[in-house]
């Protein structure tokens, strides 16, 4: 994420890595009223009433560990009725961050490496990059919130029922069929 694209985010809270210590640092975020409308538009939901995030960040050398919880009150449009309905989300967050150079070194294969792809389900995700010595907690909040949204939200109690099949109009060839049968 570049600095210019961070300016367009509706909810941005950059945090300098130097301010994070070995002991966990608590950071609480809450979107203001003006930010909520922009967040709703950004996420493609009908409205956002509340957005709060509580994070705990700790540092181990150049790496940063982030854990926390996002709480959001939103309105999404039902895919069946198109009516807005309330949605409460509680999203757990757990991420590791590392400097960009360290991530690039991890991704660069050496000449001795074989091309052997093995996917392990219990393998941890690679760390997120620390860009220019900062971590944007607003960006983290928006990403995890977007991933937690139901892509096909359905209002509770609403069921989709297929429309009744239309009775086909009488074919022009039906008259020929009747003539052939002698009716």
Predicted regions and their residues:
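Acidic and generally charged, gly/proline-rich low-complexity regions
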Residues: 2-183
